[in-house]
């Protein structure tokens, strides 16, 4: 039951579509612009740096907020489960972000929300590794999609390595295995949401990042 509650808490926070709300406030419906995606990259491409920054921070923060709420609910009674429950909350946020019911289940791709999960459940070194990898790949290739998929892959590997070395301070091995399963699910989901990007990357037609206008080839 605790797991389900955490997923539901996360899903509610995930429903806060930062990019969509910011766009509506400024007379732009992200679902009808650019890629039609309600996430950070489309906000950046369609409305510029400010919109991209606001969307990124908002989508990251909602995951951090969900984890904080879960800690408030279960922190004193489920100490050994907290890393696991935090990940369930993060998974719920990603699901809410990707599949918001009030937008006909058409949301973002969950990368910024996953970044919030990385920030709130791992350590500074994993955060820095993911950040540096993302910046390096986007700076050299200008493919945000490639950087995003690299980050979720690094996240999965990091969760397993961190967990196997006692980083989560979880005594129940079954909890660790669940955490690895959640990280695997999030990686697979991210790749699924980027399936069109993967096809374009393989064919050499993927759009390169640009701001406030048309993507460059």
Regions found by a protein language model. Name each.
Residues 9, 57-61, 133, 150-153:
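Hydrophobic residues within alpha-helical transmembrane segments
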Residues 1-25:
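N-terminal signal-anchor transmembrane alpha helix
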Residues 10-14, 90-97, 134-138, 159, ...:
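Alpha-helical transmembrane segments of multi-pass membrane proteins
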Residues 29-40, 102-115, 143-152:
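Short, non-helical or kinked segments that cap or interrupt transmembrane helices
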Residues 1-5, 67-88, 119-126, 161-181:
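Helix-coil boundary and interhelical linker segments in multi-pass alpha-helical membrane proteins
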Residues 44-49, 70-74, 111-141, 154-163:
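Interfacial segments of multi-pass membrane proteins
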Residues 45-71, 84, 103:
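Multi-pass membrane catalytic core of lipid/isoprenoid biosynthesis enzymes
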Residues 20-52, 107, 199-217:
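Cytosolic, membrane-interface loops and tails of multi-pass inner-membrane proteins
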